[in-house]
Amino acid sequence: MVLGGDAAGVERPQAAAYHGPTYGEREKTMADVVAFKKEEPNGLLLREANGPVLRLTLNNPPANALSIALMQALAAELDAVAVVKEIKVVAIAATGKVFSAGHDLKEMTLHRADEDGGKAFFEGAIRLAADIMLKIAKLPQAVIAEIDGLATAAGCQLVASCDLAICTDSSTFCTPGVNIGLFCSTPMVALSRAAHRKQAMEMLLTGETIDASTAKDFGLVNRIVPQQYLRQVVDKYAAVIASKSPQALKIGKEAFYRQAEMPLADAYDYAVGVMVENMLAGDAQEGIDAFLGKRLPEWKED
């Protein structure tokens, strides 16, 4: 990736031209897609489509707790965007000073009075969060977490589940469940796959908060930027990604997560098959021809 900087010394990708069709060149726009009407999904989740980038913003003040309503809205948006080929990148951001405090403990506590002590509700809420993380991994588009503030528990899980994570220098992260007698078992799944193993265990066993620099050292985030540049840097990453072949991105993202769970020999065997099929795909042929012909490729819709 080609990187650049500015007067603030922020290292980030150079903006790349999006060579696919523009919205004005399409008969079918976002407004034509039922799942992406002008109305917001609900007040808890804000949606903004800008060319090939969809930004979903958590909006549940004061701490953007992942209530059932917010998670249902987020799950629905991820399901909807999965089939919208015009969108190449999804950014997940948040309003306020907290990215997300995780599950809505007040909402969950209310259900302790249920006949089963809240078991059914707890399972539904925790499983819904897990399903969202799986949707992110399976989404054909790249997903970037845009963090400014605290990401804790299931909020940290959300960050760890995204393909990339970019945060401000004042952001902090933790999995504090152990502090209240509730080990962060489901956040552990994402965290152990994003961060280095020993560091993930450190976060899970101590419940202590780490700063942005430590999160980057742990492998939880990709980049740290000053707050005023956060959106700009995320947008530039999104532009770089959106300029690539959607076919290659879809194939590559799926292959990345699948091979990561395989033994080494099996992973190579699988990856050989994936790469052979990718070589036969139209975009690979176009990309190679464009490279040899010293011109920009013209990607086809996947």
Regions found by a protein language model. Give the residues of each.
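Conserved CoA-thioester-binding segment of acyl-CoA-metabolizing enzymes
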Residues: 23-95, 134
